[in-house]
Structures are given as structure tokens and as C-alpha cells.
Amino acid sequence: METNGFGMASVRFICGTQDIHRTLERRLASFLDKDDTILFAACFDANGGLFEPLLGPDDAIISDALNHASIIDGIRLCKAKRYRYANSDMAELETQLQLARANGARFIMIASDGVFSMDGYLANLPEITRLAKKYDALVMVDDCHATGFMGPKGAGTPSHFGVNVDIMTGTLGKALGGAIGGYIAGDQAVIDLLRQRARPYLFSNSLPPSIVAASLKALDIVE
């Protein structure tokens, strides 16, 4: 508070970025083995701002039926064709992938929770990533309920299963501090595009420095 103040009173791209914001983004990226990370006020905002900038009417999004409400709402905001499969039903996921390809989808993204919060079930990421490779699809995982304690170093369900996914979203409001904040981690090109087009990022005040500093300390403890 004494060195960085109470709040930023601004969005990130005007005067809402301090060194510690970028430090946290880089630390999260390294922790999750991604190129870069973009911070949001909450993971609900992260999921709400993810799909619309990346997917257009020529693309397809395939979602697990029990995904978190924020994924469902984020998908509603984008123009991609929508497909759904029953919770963890890999046969139906493959059917939907085949249908999306048959319908001429340019890009296909599979969206899933890493851990389904109501039941505690883990997504079958080994099979999801296998099918994604088979049908040339991207994989997005919301890992709010796994980051910080699952996997060899607490990096979540992909680390737990030893697989790689294209995009991860998560929260600073559970194991990584327990207050507020969310993020998207992924390839540099994806994060660069989101910084220009993700509306919750562009039009929401930056995370308070105290939250950022506490999250950095939480990462220290986890690591």
C-alpha cells in the first residue's frame, strides 16, 4: 500500500499497469508453462472475454455440458457455431468434432473445466487432447478448481495428467490468494490479440496492487 497505492483508478492500457502487474503475468505464465498471461478482475471476466475475440462465424466451439456458467456466457457472446457434449462423454465429443469438421469449421475449440466444481470430477484431458490432435482442434481449460494444488508443482489438471492444452484460464480467488482476480494463459499471439480485443480487459479497472502482491506471494508459497 505504501509503495504501490490502494488502486489504479484506470484500465490497464491507460495508467493501470505497474511493474508488479507484468511480474505476476510473467510468473503465472512460467508457472503454467505458457508464453504469457493476461490478468482480469475475475475468471468470470476472463472466460467472458476469451471466445469472442478468437472465434468468428466460420469457427466452432464445443463445450462440455457441465462447464461453469462463465464459459457458457462467454460462448454466448461469440459468433462461432456452438456444439455441446454430455459431461465427460468422449464418444459424443468425437461425434461433435466430426460434425463441426463436416460443417466446414475453420477453427475448432474444445472448452472444458479442468475440475467440475459441483461434483469434483476431473475432465478426461488425455482423451480430450488426443481427440483435439486427431481433428486439429484447440483445447481451452478453465482450471479454477485445480490450480495451486493439483499436479507435481500445483500447476493444475494439464500438469496432473502430463498433457499440454492451448489456453488455460484460472482464478486468483482460490488457492492463489483467495481474494479476486483471474487470468488467461496461452501462446504469445493469443495473449497479444486479447490485450487488444478482450472487452472485460479493455474496459475494467486494473487489479489493485495489494491483490497482485498477495498473489505473487501465494505463488512463492505454492512453488
Q: Which sequence ranges carry the predicted segments?
A:
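Short, structured coil segments at secondary-structure junctions
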Residues: P57, L77-K79, Y135, N164
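Hydrophobic beta-strand scaffold residues
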Residues: M8, I61, R82, V139-M140
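Active-site C-terminal subdomain of aminotransferase-like
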Residues: I108, Y135-L138, H145, M150-E223
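Conserved PLP-anchoring active-site segment centered on the Schiff-base-forming lysine
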Residues: L50-A69
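Conserved N-terminal alpha-helix of the aminotransferase class I/II PLP-enzyme fold
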Residues: T3-C43
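Short, small-residue-enriched loops and turns at beta-alpha junctions
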Residues: I14-T17, A69, M90-A91, G114-D119, ...
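Active-site phosphate-binding strand-loop segment of PLP-dependent enzymes
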Residues: Y83, N87-V141
